[in-house]
């Protein structure tokens, strides 16, 4: 997979590495964020807690660093799954990414969104989130719709099992 500037990768549709972080709280709710409208693509859309592009071989370090930069969250992350997608996201942007999805759990509601990256955040019940996505799919990023669909089909029980120690 190529190592080039992310803007070039998106303009030319060149395949590259990315990561997406899912965060759940001790009530089992997922943190979602609405990206700042000024973002160069997918601005103003709802998505998972944070995303980024993998530059080094240390995926967990990069994801934890990005999570702190965007939301002020520090937590342990675990690999959940990986997928590839190739989608046009605007008239000039193409997402051709191998996306590693990571998951983390927090006991706190203390979130400190970076206003340059994030317009707002909210905690959502996963079932309600799926309903909102079905009703208004254009309000959500392409990759987040793929992720939530995959989680619903294959990983929901695993996530609930992971939440059990946090709820105790």
Q: Which functions belong to the PLM regions below?
A:
Residues 1-20, 26:
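Acidic, metal-coordinating catalytic segment for phosphate/diphosphate chemistry
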Residues 7, 43-44, 81-84, 89, ...:
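Nudix hydrolase/Nudix homology domain
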Residues 18-53:
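A glycine-rich, hydrophobic loop/mini-helix early in the fold
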Residues 14-24, 52-57, 131-145:
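Short, surface-exposed secondary-structure junctions/capping segments
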Residues 21, 50, 79, 100-102:
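A structural signal for short, well-ordered beta-strand segments
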Residues 31-32, 49-80:
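The catalytic Nudix box helix
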